[in-house]
Amino acid sequence: MKNGIEAMITDITATTAEAEDYTGEDGLLYCGKCHTPKEAYFAEGKTCFGRDRHPAECDCQRAAREKQQAAESRQKHLEKVEDLKRRGFTDPAMRNWTFEHDNGRNPQTETARFYVESWETMQAENIGYLFWGGVGTGKSYLAACIAHALMEKEVAVCMTNFATILNDLAASFDGRNEYISRLCSYPLLILDDFGMERGTEYGLEQVYSVIDSRYRSGKPLIATTNLTLEELQHPQDTPHARIYDRLTSMCAPVRFTGSNFRKETAQEKLERLKQLMKQRKESL
């Protein structure tokens, strides 16, 4: 057994030499490429089964190892981010809504970027955003940009809407508490198109349950809505008042103004279509 252990340790402490390697003046094996030691002596007077040296990384071995580790780390990061995005967006179209694809015309882009840059503070102090304003002013887009940027930092975000939530709850009523708990487990929850859900008694009760649970979780919430701040601050009835009171206490209001980007995009497509038709006509 002893001979077997000695053989194993000898193999471990032995250094494999390449053809271009050489022995330096200090008696150690040197790399023929980077000319740094591939061995190191044990502390003075110390040996291991008669050997006074052990393998060491030369500079090029270290560089190769670090490069490999960086590649593996990068791959793990990409896989993690891809999984977060797959799970985090209920609308696949939103996966292309990023700061990189933003045209820079929305004046609230910097406000959205600030949230990402200040995420640790926003999370610690439970600060959310309430993006409110007219249809097509970029509220959902910038909310998705925030989600993407945080996911790139490996922060789990769920961006959904109450139409989806209510459908999910109706389909799995027995797991209602578990479903809401899962929503509240995300470090950041984004509710898109808030206020557009059906206003039935059941629907409003579920909306309040989600908002209230998120409030009690102490985790930030971002919501987008076409409702005005006036409508949110002066609701029409008690059920809406309960919901809006919770929402406005969690989220700082951010107003979105300006032109309807969707209408502009539609107009651009129409003009492009006319141009293509004209080109075809001229080519005939």
Kindly label every feature range from the protein language model.
Residues 1-103, 264-284:
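A short, basic N-terminal segment
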Residues 60, 104, 162, 256-258:
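Active-site donor-binding loop signature of nucleotide-sugar glycosyltransferases
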Residues 95-129:
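Pre-Walker A (pre-P-loop) alpha-helix and adjacent loop at the N terminus of AAA/AAA+ ATPase modules
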Residues 107-116, 124, 147-188, 198-205:
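Short glycine-rich substrate-engagement loop in P-loop NTPases that contacts/grips substrate
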Residues 123-143:
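Walker A/P-loop nucleotide-binding motif
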Residues 127-131, 187-189, 221:
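Generic beta-sheet signal
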Residues 193-194:
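Walker B catalytic acidic pair
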